[in-house]
Amino acid sequence: MMNGKKVLVAMSGGVDSSAAAVLLRQQGYSCDGAMLRLYNGEVEGTCCSADDAADARSVAYGLGMKFYVFNETERFARDVMDRFVAEYCAGRTPNPCIDCNRCLKFGALLERALLLGYDYLATGHYARVKLDEASGKYRLLRGRDRSKDQSYVLYQLGQHQLAHLLLPVGEYDKPSIRRSARQAGLINADKSDSQDICFVPDGDYTRFLQEYGGVKMIPGDFVDRAGHVLGRHKGLPCYTTGQRKGLGVSAGKHVYVLRKNVQDNTILLGDNEELFTSVLTADQVNWISGETPASPLRVTAKTRYSQTEAAATVHPLPDGRIRVEFDVPQRAITAGQAVVLYDGEQVLGGGTIE
């Protein structure tokens, strides 16, 4: 039975977003599909490619849905790829998936959905949205399948976006989603999951920075805390905090990247133990509730997508930033990555590590 609500489903050509359309139609929603065109001829990508678009269109038509393709190449280049280049050049390690979600999926695409008269945007993310009746606030929760949970990359969502967002896949585990897709006869039911950064499909960030961003790799010194030169590096963007392999340094022991210094183009190396720290600060903070806590909060937090959260206290600072103090030191906290805060299953928000 139809419930009268119209949904625009963001389809990537993968099984999760396609299954989202199947699940929503079963729940009585009137669904159409849409994909964002993110690349021009200069960049090859593994997400939203021509093959992906063909798969998504085939699924949409097979389900009796309309299918739109919206050109967002300029916005993707400006807000995601150009920022990726700028962050690496500033000595940080960004997470472009978070920028894409904020600016494209839940920015440009949600705007288009609402302008076209849809009530909701839906995606295939493994996370959940719930309305808290007592407060009237929408809450972002982890996906039920903890091994696939994608709530980390959604921490920048706000109340307006959550009010118009459906995440049906988040209620299921991956095997159930594939089973639903097979039962619906979807051509991509067994399609493999995408990996890595979509616009760097081969994982060669250095080559991307050089060819797309025009970045020149300037060699410099590897140094220790005493200022001794341990060797030469190939350019700051070639390395990330915590890296051990590929340094080309003979120090008589394992050494790791501790910090990249943009000012003098050096990279500080040291022992693994020196990578652990208990405190970080973050800016560009988002609180999903829209309200900054008035006092410190006990939370769990993680600083990488694949990491398990750790107990911490978050201190809101007067300038809008946060200071996060972990109970147990964390390894390789990296500038440019996101720290995301949880209260049990609920995502409270997060920020960009300084």
Short names for language-model regions:
Residues 1-155, 166, 175, 182:
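ATP-dependent adenylation/nucleotidyltransferase module used to activate substrates
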Residues 40-41, 122-354:
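AMP-forming adenylation/ATP pyrophosphatase catalytic core
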